[in-house]
Amino acid sequence: TTVMWDYKSMKPIKIFNTPGAALEARWSFKPGDNWAVTTTALTSNIYVYKQDDKGEWQQHNVGTIGDPSKIPLPVDIALNSDGKSMWINTFMDGMTRLWDMSDPLHPKETYTKKIGNQVNMVSPSFDGKRVYYTTSLVSNWDQKNQANDQFLKAYNWDGKELKLAFEIDFLKEKLGRAHHMKFQARDLKTLQPLQASTTAKVNVVSN
């Protein structure tokens, strides 16, 4: 299931039947937008949540990621700050996919790239020109032996192609497993740039 909450009253607004294990949910930050999106790990679907003409929230199955029969396992998703596109990572095949979300009820896949043997988290910069990836999902589920990629990779995005900027091999550096990232360049309450005295940074947490 997917549950939409009213954070002011701390009560659920609506409970949706979302088969296939929805993992991450994201809201569009584009001014004027009022929709959210999730993906399902086991069925490789994209679901969008929007209000209908009566103000009732509805769930829409709007897309399929990869070949569901092979269980690519969609894990992390990240909407770009303009709300026009979304990165989707699939863990089992190590792929990242860019979807055009300018019409959220009719999204289209526009780009794919293999990041490694496995890939988990994705975090685009607020200007959309850089994209960061880490690889570990859960230690017991990560690939084994030579396929056990544990890295942070940073790419530059020119609108057409991801080009590797740098990478950190967590196994080589004895840093553990590269799981979660937090990229911060703006105040998340106002979406305004942080003060010049505070530099933008990437925090990486290993699990």
Give a label for each model feature:
Residues 1-207:
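Predominantly soluble domains enriched in secretory-pathway, periplasmic, or organellar proteins
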